Amino acid sequence: MRIAVIGAMEEEVRILRDKLEQAEIESVAGCEFTKGMLVGHEVILLKSGIGKVNAAMSTTILLERYQPEKVINTGSAGGFHHALNVGDVVISTEVRHHDVDVTAFNYEYGQVPGMPPGFKADKELVALAEQCMKEEENIQVVKGMIATGDSFMSDPNRVAAIRGKFENLYAVEMEAAAVAQVCHQYNVPFVIIRALSDIAGKESNVSFDQFLDQAALHSTNFIVKVLKELK
């Protein structure tokens, strides 16, 4: 099976790239694609760059050029739920934009005109990820909504504003909704699996740097477990 894994930054893809066998690297429009084999699957690892435009552009190239059967977006995120801690993992059930507002024209907050209000992750991939999480003992793994915007959430006032827009929001980051929207348009199953590098609004600029490597390791290990179970 051909599986695409997307991470925004070098820190988020480096560990997984080192695990790929027969790796071949290709650069297209500033995006790094690494093809290789891992646990019996052909894996296309994309380093997309940070933010929604980079994520949308590179995911489009990915789907057109490599035609993966499934897409997994990995990396770090800011935790938005009071019960979560740094290093915990969030599996997406739904992904939304948190910086889109066309409510003046009767769209839901976060809804892009012509698109659904949110993008549903593939139920089979979510269930598989949830099954894999049962083996985790020292890391809390939850499933829920992830929201995306082109901002790093270090301002408590902005955090409070976003919390007021979405119920049961578990994490925020800067690429997932763009990846999900492109996958929706191409009808390619996707899931977002993010490890928390910080808790939004609580000294985010400090804890992000401190815990990014830990979050990347947790996320990568979890991705490998999911790949092992994919049939």
UniProtKB/Swiss-Prot annotation:
Substrate binds at residues 78, 153, 174-175. Gene3D superfamilies: Nucleoside phosphorylase domain (3.40.50.1580). GO terms for cellular component: cytosol. Pathway: Amino-acid biosynthesis; L-methionine biosynthesis via salvage pathway; S-methyl-5-thio-alpha-D-ribose 1-phosphate from S-methyl-5'-thioadenosine (hydrolase route): step 1/2. Its EC number is 3.2.2.9. It holds the Pfam family PNP_UDP_1. It is an enzyme of class 3 (hydrolase). The keyword Phosphoprotein does not apply. The keyword Amino-acid biosynthesis applies. It catalyses: S-adenosyl-L-homocysteine + H2O = S-(5-deoxy-D-ribos-5-yl)-L-homocysteine + adenine; S-methyl-5'-thioadenosine + H2O = 5-(methylsulfanyl)-D-ribose + adenine; 5'-deoxyadenosine + H2O = 5-deoxy-D-ribose + adenine. Keywords: Amino-acid biosynthesis, Hydrolase, Methionine biosynthesis. One of its GO terms (biological process) is L-methionine salvage from methylthioadenosine. One of its GO terms (molecular function) is adenosylhomocysteine nucleosidase activity. It comes from the Bacteria. The active site is at residues 12, 198. Catalyzes the irreversible cleavage of the glycosidic bond in both 5'-methylthioadenosine (MTA) and S-adenosylhomocysteine (SAH/AdoHcy) to adenine and the corresponding thioribose, 5'-methylthioribose and S-ribosylhomocysteine, respectively. Also cleaves 5'-deoxyadenosine, a toxic by-product of radical S-adenosylmethionine (SAM) enzymes, into 5-deoxyribose and adenine. Belongs to the PNP/UDP phosphorylase family. MtnN subfamily. This is 5'-methylthioadenosine/S-adenosylhomocysteine nucleosidase.
